Design a protein with these regions (language model features):
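A charge-rich, low-complexity, intrinsically flexible signal that marks solvent-exposed coils, linkers
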Residues: 1-58
Length: 58
């Protein structure tokens, strides 16, 4: 069984799907915590993230 790699999104990119996205550190993929989760609508841009973090769908 193989683990599926989640797609990473960065601030300013267009969101492909309305969903809740969590922030993860770029260097080791550590989850920043639920207080930094953001709901982003399809077609909108991802909001600013923590320094050196990206978004992944939850």
């Amino acid at each position: 069984m193989f683990a599926r790699t989640k797609t990473k999104y960065w601030s300013g990119q267009i969101c492909p799907k309305t969903a809740t996205y969590g922030q993860h550190r770029d260097t080791d993929n550590t989850y920043a915590g639920s207080q930094y989760d953001r709901r982003v609508d399809k077609g909108e841009r991802f909001p600013p993230s923590l320094n050196n973090h990206h978004f992944e769908e939850k």
